Amino acid sequence: MKYDTSELCDIYHEEVNVVEPLFSNFGGRSSFGGQIITVKCFEDNGLLYDLLEENGRGRVLVIDGGGSVRRALVNAELGRLAVQNEWEGIVVYGAVRQVDDLEELDIGIQAMAAIPVGADSDGIGESDIRVNFGGVTFFSGDHLYADNTGIILAEEPLDIE
């Protein structure tokens, strides 16, 4: 499904929170949306493998990487795993790598930057917790909509037909 965050903001201005414009699109989908699962991990993507192995139909993984752009949390392998398990998208408050490969995948991926250095994979982090970045607080179960213009968040799903 295609999402237009500008139009959604016009219609649902009272119901949505707008994430500060810190992100760029690195995935093959220009827009994506769904119910979010949150994870907090700093320069370590081990936990992301476990989460992305789950069925992601209708879901978006929101990763609070502390805003670090020193190491990439999402790589092509994680992107392919997410596509295989039908995730709608990934938002990374941090960096990604292997961007040419990510761009070929049928998934939305928004991140702050790209860097060739990979993350540790010790599995350090927490999931299903409140995370805050870009001027917005994210809770697992909220609904996120993203396109090349921006990212918005709503507590309930928006009627988009």
From Swiss-Prot:
It is found in: Cytoplasm. Its main location: cytoplasm. GO terms for biological process: negative regulation of RNA catabolic process. Disulfide bonds: none annotated. GO terms for cellular component: cytosol. InterPro entries: RraA, RraA/RraA-like, RraA/RraA-like_sf, RraA_gpbac. Keywords: Cytoplasm. The keyword Translocase does not apply. Pfam families: RraA-like (PF03737). CDD domains: RraA_family. One of its GO terms (molecular function) is enzyme binding. Globally modulates RNA abundance by binding to RNase E (Rne) and regulating its endonucleolytic activity. Can modulate Rne action in a substrate-dependent manner by altering the composition of the degradosome. Modulates RNA-binding and helicase activities of the degradosome. Homotrimer. Binds to both RNA-binding sites in the C-terminal region of Rne and to RhlB. Belongs to the RraA family. This is Regulator of ribonuclease activity A. It comes from Edwardsiella ictaluri (strain 93-146). The gene is rraA.
